[in-house]
């Protein structure tokens, strides 16, 4: 899910959709309005799920999509290689996610993890 807001309402550390990918905002710089135009904002962001840097330039009055990013808890059912089978602790839905490199040694059956969900994508963020 996503909602529309004006560019002037965005803040560093917030989220924005760039190229249909939810991104975390790293920096926002606003240029002053010129003789024949409105102020423009340059937004530098990094993809939540693919860690790719992206940037856009928009007028501050333009509307832009902001993803709704949810943090949820899940229990590890099993770990096979670098794929973990998880069960959401609220909906009891089971699904598989790739295990981040830094968490591979900590993944054990029965432990809990925090994962991000936005625009139909999921990612393990950290251990609970």
UniProtKB/Swiss-Prot annotation:
InterPro entries: IF5A-like, IF5A-like_N, NA-bd_OB-fold, Rib_uL2_dom2, Trans_elong_IF5A_hypusine_site, Transl_elong_IF5A_arc, Transl_elong_IF5A_C, Translation_prot_SH3-like_sf. One of its GO terms (cellular component) is cytoplasm. Pfam families: eIF-5a, IF5A-like_N. Its main location: cytoplasm. It is found in: Cytoplasm. Gene3D superfamilies: 2.30.30.30, Nucleic acid-binding proteins (2.40.50.140). Keywords: Cytoplasm, Hypusine, Initiation factor, Protein biosynthesis. PROSITE patterns: IF5A_HYPUSINE. Belongs to the eIF-5A family. This is Translation initiation factor 5A.
């Amino acid at each position: 899910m996503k909602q529309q807001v004006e560019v002037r309402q965005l803040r560093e550390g917030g989220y924005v959709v760039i190229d249909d990918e939810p991104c975390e905002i790293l920096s926002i710089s606003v240029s002053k309005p010129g003789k024949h135009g409105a102020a423009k904002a340059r937004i530098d962001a990094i993809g939540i799920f693919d860690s790719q840097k992206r940037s856009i330039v928009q007028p501050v009055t333009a509307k832009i999509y902001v993803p709704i990013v949810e943090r949820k808890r899940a229990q590890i059912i099993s770990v096979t290689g670098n794929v973990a089978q998880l069960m959401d602790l609220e909906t009891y839905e089971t699904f598989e996610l790739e295990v981040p490199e830094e968490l591979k040694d900590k993944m054990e059956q029965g432990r809990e993890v925090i994962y991000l969900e936005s625009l139909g994508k999921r990612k393990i963020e950290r251990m609970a």
